[in-house]
């Protein structure tokens, strides 16, 4: 009789274990998926998120070479650093200047008006050296990790 009791107990434990929800392991669709990281960068289920992409183009008021231009660009770089430090500016960089295309900003926002206000604080915009075009952009949420990676690969960060 004890053998039957232990056998029955073992069977119930086995069946019971199968009906209890298991602790969640890796996602079978993507074993590398990190839900904590995904939430931190604002990722949706596809690993994407919304941004505002800003294209900087040559404006109507070219500032000639000299102290005023130097000071304007010094302020431009300081403004980008401030916005990046605040977690608002995700990516920035220059274009080749062809067809008046001067640079690119990607902001961690989906609100064009809010982004317009942030961009208006840049001296190159305020002085008319450049004008900005605003576009909603849907891209990888991993872009939010670029700043931390940049600091690891830039020998002389900006």
What is the meaning of each model-derived region?
Residues 23-158:
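Conserved, structured core segments of small domains
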Residues 1-4:
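Positively charged n-region of N-terminal signal peptides that target proteins for export
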Residues 18-22:
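Sec/Tat signal peptide C-region and signal peptidase I cleavage site
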Residues 7-16:
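Bacterial N-terminal signal peptides
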């Amino acid at each position: 009789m004890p053998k039957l009791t232990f056998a029955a107990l073992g069977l119930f434990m086995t069946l019971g274990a199968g009906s209890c929800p298991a602790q969640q392991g890796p996602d079978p669709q993507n074993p590398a998926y990190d839900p904590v990281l995904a939430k931190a960068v604002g990722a949706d289920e596809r690993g994407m998120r919304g941004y505002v992409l800003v294209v900087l183009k040559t404006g109507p008021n070219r500032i000639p070479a000299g102290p005023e231009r130097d000071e304007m660009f010094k302020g431009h770089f300081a403004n980008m650093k401030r916005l990046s430090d605040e977690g608002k500016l995700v990516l920035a960089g220059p274009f080749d200047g062809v067809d008046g295309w001067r640079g690119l900003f990607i902001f961690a926002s989906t609100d064009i008006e809010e982004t317009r206000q942030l961009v208006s604080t840049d001296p190159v915009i305020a002085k008319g050296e450049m004008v900005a075009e605003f576009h909603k952009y849907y891209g990888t949420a991993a872009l939010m990790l670029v700043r931390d990676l940049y600091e690891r690969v830039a020998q002389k960060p900006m």
